[in-house]
């Protein structure tokens, strides 16, 4: 019958929705439809497989969307990770080693007090974790970042500009949750890439 994801998406657009949620952009056809819809003043939410927020921008460029279109249609780029939460039933404090702290980029001299981990219990099936929470990395599209996108800048340049504009990395967001006793250092290492 010739029904494809792209043709279905075009059919949805004929209904003139105010907001469009696209499960995932995997190819240039879907990306092209999403970009054109966003450029006509509609709000589009979608997902793209990438390691972090700057990588999402370069992924859209790699799919084949023109830099001026990518720069014009994005308002916010966000990366997220779901991390395991320490079980509240068996949560216990411990003093981290200087090596542990240094491994994730924390200054051992600045960390005061205990960090936490779960020792394992029946509530968490002896894992030390129960439930999940999200950590986020967001890039509001500032003028300077748009300019880099228009120029087809590489991922590192986009990342640096985003950091200069206050972006909190996934690792930094995770470490904030370590320091407030919600997740473990191991979860930060497992779920985030090492900062350069």
Language-model features: locations:
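Short, flexible helix-loop junctions that flank or precede catalytic/ligand sites
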Residues: 1-196
């Amino acid at each position: 019958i010739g029904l494809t994801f792209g043709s279905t998406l075009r059919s949805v657009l004929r209904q003139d929705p105010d907001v469009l949620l696209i499960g995932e952009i995997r190819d240039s056809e879907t990306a092209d439809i999403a970009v054109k819809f966003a450029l006509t003043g509609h709000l589009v939410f979608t997902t793209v497989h990438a390691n972090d927020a700057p990588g999402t921008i370069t992924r859209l460029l790699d799919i084949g969307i023109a830099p001026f279109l990518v720069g014009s249609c994005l308002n916010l780029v966000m990366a997220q990770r779901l991390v395991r939460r320490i079980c509240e039933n068996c949560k216990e404090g411990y003093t981290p080693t200087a090596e542990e702290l240094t491994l994730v980029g924390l200054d051992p001299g600045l960390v005061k007090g205990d960090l936490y981990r779960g020792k394992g219990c029946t509530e968490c099936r002896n894992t030390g974790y129960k439930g999940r929470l999200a950590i986020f990395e967001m890039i509001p599209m500032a003028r300077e970042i748009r300019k880099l996108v228009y120029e087809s800048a590489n991922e590192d340049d986009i990342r640096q500009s985003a950091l200069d504009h206050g972006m909190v990395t996934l690792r930094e967001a995770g470490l904030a949750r370590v320091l407030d006793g919600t997740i473990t250092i191991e979860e930060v290492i497992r779920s985030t890439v090492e900062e350069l």
